[in-house]
């Protein structure tokens, strides 16, 4: 019951803070203009990620104070401080457009500090026959993972409602998993872990509430965008939560309905499948055409759906539905498939996604041409 209170608190904080924040952005002309690859028209306030962060932080701190977590260590406070730094990098980028190089350096630096406080993958838990990995390799893989996930999330923030709904899907699944699977697991075997189930439940429910509040103002026609401020902060938080869940899941000894999870690490990645799969698809597409994988174009999934006549709200709901269905299927498959077969399943799902998307959009384009 208490989790509902904290979720409602973050929702109300976002809902109440957003209107004055929008007016502040409009007053100081901190607006996102249309043109280029952008689908929206006119000028729209951005940096909505600031309100999402503040609202979720208020909820988390409220939870810590009310529930009096004696086992909440300095790591949680260090984590909040580092997430504040990520937010500031995003604000700076929204206001002055940081160069990709500077932005990457900032991401790596924050990633390193997060690894230092224990937010990293410590073991492969039997994947490829590997268990505990060297610290230096753990740092490299974890930082790379944070950079990839945060940038993949940033790349899907192209239409009203899509980035918010994708993050909402992940945090809902995360909350359910921590609540029903990891609730009584507050210690892990690795020494420098970040094992505090109650803290991560607070993070998940706070983000669910603040994202719902944000979507009220970000739904088509959007009154505000989350901006790089939001996409960088939320993208990093998604990566962090995935790394934490990998450690919890790797050491999980519980069964659900007498069934044991056989693929511990890879199932976590599938909760964020669509952004990662679409980013890989677009990068390969660009390379095949002799372009840099980082060059800008209009080939992301939301661009394709927009091309066949879908409105922002329909695109957001369609991509959300795809992600939810894939998450449910992937969780079910984790009870059936060992790691090696789960890898084959992931590769197969990517091909189904790529060729299914291509066939669907081409079919709709042909129908539109016939009508004309």
Residue ranges and their predicted role:
Residues 94, 124-133, 310:
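Membrane interface segments of multi-pass transport proteins and intramembrane proteases
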Residues 96, 148-170, 231-232:
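Short acidic, Gly/Ser-rich segments with clustered Asp/Glu that frequently serve as metal-coordination loops
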Residues 132-142, 198-202, 263:
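Membrane-interfacial loop-to-helix junctions in multi-pass transporters
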Residues 33-46:
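Juxtamembrane helix-capping/reentrant segments at transmembrane boundaries
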Residues 81-89, 106-121, 141-151, 167-173, ...:
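Membrane-embedded alpha-helical core segments of multi-pass
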């Amino acid at each position: 019951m208490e989790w509902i209170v904290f979720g409602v608190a973050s929702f109300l904080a976002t809902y109440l803070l957003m209107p004055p924040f929008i007016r502040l952005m409009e007053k100081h002309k901190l607006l996102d203009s249309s043109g280029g690859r952008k689908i929206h028209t006119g000028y729209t306030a951005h940096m909505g990620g600031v309100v999402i962060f503040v609202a979720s932080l208020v909820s988390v701190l409220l939870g810590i104070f009310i529930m009096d977590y004696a086992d909440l260590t300095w790591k949680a406070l260090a984590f909040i401080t580092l997430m504040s730094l990520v937010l500031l990098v995003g604000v700076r980028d929204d206001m002055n457009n940081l160069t990709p190089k500077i932005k990457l350096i900032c991401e790596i630096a924050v990633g390193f500090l997060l690894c230092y406080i224990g937010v990293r993958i410590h073991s492969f838990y039997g994947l490829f026959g590997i268990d505990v990995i060297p610290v230096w390799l753990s740092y490299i893989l974890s930082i790379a993972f944070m950079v990839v996930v945060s940038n993949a999330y940033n790349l899907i923030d192209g239409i009203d409602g899509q980035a918010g709904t994708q993050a909402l899907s992940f945090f809902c699944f995360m909350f359910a998993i921590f609540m029903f699977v990891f609730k009584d697991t507050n210690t892990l075997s690795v020494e420098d872990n970040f094992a505090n189930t109650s803290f991560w439940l607070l993070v998940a429910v706070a983000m669910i509430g603040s994202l719902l509040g944000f979507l009220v103002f970000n739904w088509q026609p959007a009154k505000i965008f989350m901006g790089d401020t939001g996409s960088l902060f939320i993208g990093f938080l998604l990566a962090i939560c995935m790394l934490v869940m990998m450690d919890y899941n790797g050491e999980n000894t519980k069964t659900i309905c007498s069934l044991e999870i056989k693929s511990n690490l890879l199932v976590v990645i599938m909760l964020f499948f669509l952004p990662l799969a679409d980013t890989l698809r677009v990068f390969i597409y660009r390379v095949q055409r002799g372009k840099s994988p980082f060059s800008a174009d209009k080939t992301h999934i939301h661009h394709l759906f927009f091309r066949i006549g879908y409105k922002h709200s329909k695109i957001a709901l369609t991509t959300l539905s795809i992600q939810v269905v894939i998450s449910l299927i992937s969780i079910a498959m984790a009870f059936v498939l060992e790691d090696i077969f789960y890898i084959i399943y992931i590769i197969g799902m990517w091909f189904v996604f790529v060729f299914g998307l291509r066939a669907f959009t081409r079919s709709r384009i042909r129908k539109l041409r016939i009508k004309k």
